[in-house]
Amino acid sequence: MASSTLSSLSSTPLQHSFAANLKTCSQFPNKSSGFMVFAQKKTKKTRKIILKEDIVNVGKKGELLDVRVGFFRNFLFPSGKAQLVTPGVLKEMKIEEERIEAEKRRVLEEAQQLALFFETFGAFKVKRKGGKGKQIFGSVTAQDLVDIIKAQLQREVDKRIVNLPEIRETGEYIAELKLHPDVTAKVRVNVIAN
């Protein structure tokens, strides 16, 4: 019992001292002065980099990215997969992009000229052994057309770019040559029975 009275007696002065402190803390000495709060937000530290090779879930080679400092310092830089962006590097990157664009334009122009040449050439003649009526033995394949183009025009063409309808009869057909993603040449193919 003595211990319970001791604890009850000792807790009341403590409560009074806390209450007294709370009153003094909540009151401002001068009500006309402003109350200022300073808060600092942690900033994200990033670096601008250029990737030297393709990295899964990060980006492709030559891409300009903002990455965390730790990721660059601990992974990208030691493994040689990225470099920091400097004015000199940006200038080199711009020159390289211009060179690549010029090369793309040159390839597109060559493909357009080649398409015009194929379309104005006329028809490629394919001879096959004939059967009943207009039927032929076998069919004309993309490889046959590639061989004929090589023989008549001395031009190498990959058979994967040739889109040829199924040819099992004599007559005139139109084949497509996909010379560039933006350029397709249409060529006529005359199938003649021997």
Swiss-Prot record:
UniProt keywords, alphabetically: Chloroplast, Plastid, Ribonucleoprotein, Ribosomal protein, RNA-binding, rRNA-binding, Transit peptide
UniProt entry tagged with the keyword Chloroplast: yes
Quaternary structure, from the entry: Part of the 50S ribosomal subunit.
PANTHER family attached to this UniProt entry: 50S RIBOSOMAL PROTEIN L9
Compartments where found: Plastid, Chloroplast
GO BP: any one term: translation
Superkingdom as given in the UniProt entry: Eukaryota
Coiled coil segments of this chain: none
Keyword Hydrolase set for record: no
One of the Pfam families matching this protein, by short name: Ribosomal_L9_C
Protein name (Swiss-Prot/TrEMBL): Large ribosomal subunit protein bL9c
Main location: plastid
Record-stated family: Belongs to the bacterial ribosomal protein bL9 family.
One Gene Ontology MF term: rRNA binding
One GO cellular component term noted in the UniProt record for this chain: ribonucleoprotein complex
Organism: Pisum sativum (Garden pea)
Matches recorded under NCBIfam families: L9
InterPro entries: Ribosomal_bL9, Ribosomal_bL9/RNase_H1_N, Ribosomal_bL9_bac/chp, Ribosomal_bL9_C, Ribosomal_bL9_C_sf, Ribosomal_bL9_N, Ribosomal_bL9_N_sf
